[in-house]
């Protein structure tokens, strides 16, 4: 322990007092039930759902106690995390039969149940869903085609990659099983697929534990083999990008073999509790609590790292919680950094207590010395990588893109857009060039031919080299505020899917706004009103009637106050580390709140006193809360002018945001007259936004890229603001619209699929630009990337995208980059929220958000994933420049 202070021991459990109105609301003594965490909704905080189990046992001191099937139940109880109150639920619809030793998993605001055993024998393998949408509790029986896992009990199931229901092992009444099945919840009709995983397969077993880590690894732990012996091994099941699943044996030594135990993940730490040994003897006290730290690849107990299995005469100091946790067949779930345990069996005594442990040192999993580059190899062994490093010769597995991939239907929708996007991008470009009389302009020869200067130390406070942290920080795919502590670390080796990009789109020209406005003195505290109303990372909720809370006069005054600040800022900002960098938000205000909630927010109650914020543009369009997004960012700029920084994106232009949702949103939410007034005023403000930022003179941040025309930072600095796209500036067009080529093997300049006149630039251009300007890194936004961030040019350029599930179809993650004082850059990610599947009430036709996005996608669809073959009709436009 002394040499590895970042390895924190297993937590201590204690009894938690709970409340209920009637005795019927309390779950009472029971075992072999399930306890499942359900994320918070708009109207309710996080909950635990307790279902089924046995309320009576048979046998005595002379025999191994077993559940009495006549005492098995199908009652449902809900525990409110915030009020600590139990309530019995009586959902509508046909409930599943009474059962115990079944399996359960949360899917959004629903809980799925499968299998088990009851008074009538084995339960069927039907899937039952408890739907809690809008707090209207209802049972659904899910129709699944074809053969399934079959009736079984003592098995495990969880939702993997927020998409696949995976169930493994168990007992079919004749023997213990070793098979594995998966059901893709994103594809209808629903079909169980029997998996044929590669790798070291676990032996047949029952009464194991299984839990899915937030990045997509399903961990199987312990169990009882065919001879009745307890097992102490652990296996990870993961899916490669080609669809092939693989079992991998986990390293480390468990404190004890066990079965009929429970295990749940909190971040990267699997918390294991209770269990029994051969013959049904409850596990020894000192081994009753354990943690498998998957970030370090070691097992821990209350005293630290475990190097060998504990004997029954362990020398560990006794702790009251040891005896408390001696139990089996209990239920367990985690919410945030807390682990909850209910009931179970100890000897011949049914338990009804409710326990909690807090993984208070959990955040050290993210900031611990383990993350340092000289220790990255300690996290895995050659046979098993907790960072999901793939076997040699295969593609990396269960990366952020797993469960974030595009289905065929989504790809078809994206493909429809290439011609439309090319048309609008081309029209903007050609209109600007014709107006300036500079069509087919080439870069200045003086700039292009200036000598390349080798990078040298510039004497700034941060003299260390810029480097990307070896691990990214990823938060679970859950609703804001519900599982807010569910964070894990992901090795960057895993992000080899970084050439997959989606291209945002455009379509047709629109006149530049001409309406001018008179200015009045800005009301005192207007920006504070905005911050108070919107900066609510934990509990912000979309307005029910969609009416925006500011009127046009207030919008004008807010824009004026922010404009005065932007007018006095440089075109290229000079910034210092530490700083957080955000990519495209596109009106997805909920994602901004999630990022603030999980990784800190700009307030004196947050982290603004010691870290700055930089936003790279594209604040509006596409999402349905562009007004909230831009007004909050402007208010934060007014409140913290030296700490919050905004630069311009290509959607901060009237020609573009008239087409992709912002103008429509302003009219819809503010009325036609006030809406057009506000939309025009915002676009006047956008013309004053800075265009790039330098961090410590070593990192340049921009929205698009360097294109064909930008060779020096001075070219950007010379752009005079305010400026509109019809000014015909080739530098501005490249800065806001250009993209890197598809991958590092494609050098030089090539036409951009966005439209004629736009280009992509190769890694050679990036290297040349960095050398010439003594820079080490370019951070840019502009393109949707599946993992939220993507490296290019051997890591000299990073693309950053912060909005998740772009256009409602991309299913991408969102990310920010945290640039530390030592210029070490840590990517921090969020997944898209789980889709509301399996529920008629939550189908797309019932979702306002989906309807907004779908209608816009039909009119202005995004283009296909980067790297897909270009359609035959468009290949002629891809001549080399």
UniProtKB/Swiss-Prot annotation:
Assembly and oligomerization: Interacts with CDG1 and CDL1.
Cofactor comment text: Binds 2 manganese ions per subunit.
One Pfam family per UniProt: Kelch_KLHDC2_KLHL20_DRC7
Keywords: Hydrolase, Kelch repeat, Manganese, Metal-binding, Nucleus, Phosphoprotein, Protein phosphatase, Repeat
Tissue occurrence: Expressed in mature cauline leaves and at the tip of influorescence, including flowers. Expressed at lower level in young tissues relative to older ones.
Protein name from the UniProt record: Serine/threonine-protein phosphatase BSL1
Main location: nucleus
Compartment annotation: Nucleus
The reaction(s) this protein catalyses: O-phospho-L-seryl-[protein] + H2O = L-seryl-[protein] + phosphate; O-phospho-L-threonyl-[protein] + H2O = L-threonyl-[protein] + phosphate
Active site: 651 (proton donor)
GO BP annotation list: brassinosteroid mediated signaling pathway
Kelch repeat residues: 60-109, 269-320, 338-385
GO molecular function: metal ion binding; protein serine/threonine phosphatase activity
EC number from the UniProt entry: 3.1.3.16
Function: Phosphatase involved in elongation process, probably by acting as a regulator of brassinolide signaling.
Annotated binding of Mn(2+) 2, by residue: 618, 650, 703, 782
Disulfide bonds: none
Region annotated Disordered, chain positions: 368-407, 436-464, 503-522, 837-881
Binding site for Mn(2+) 1: 584, 586, 618
Gene this protein is translated from: BSL1
The organism of origin for this protein: Arabidopsis thaliana (Mouse-ear cress)
Alphabetical list of CDD domains matching this protein: MPP_Bsu1_C
Cofactors: Mn(2+)
Higher taxonomy: Eukaryota, Viridiplantae, Streptophyta, Embryophyta, Tracheophyta
Compositionally biased region (Polar residues): 374-383, 445-460
Modified residues (Phosphoserine): 491, 839
Entry GO terms, CC: cytosol; nucleus
Family stated for the protein in its record: Belongs to the PPP phosphatase family. BSU subfamily.
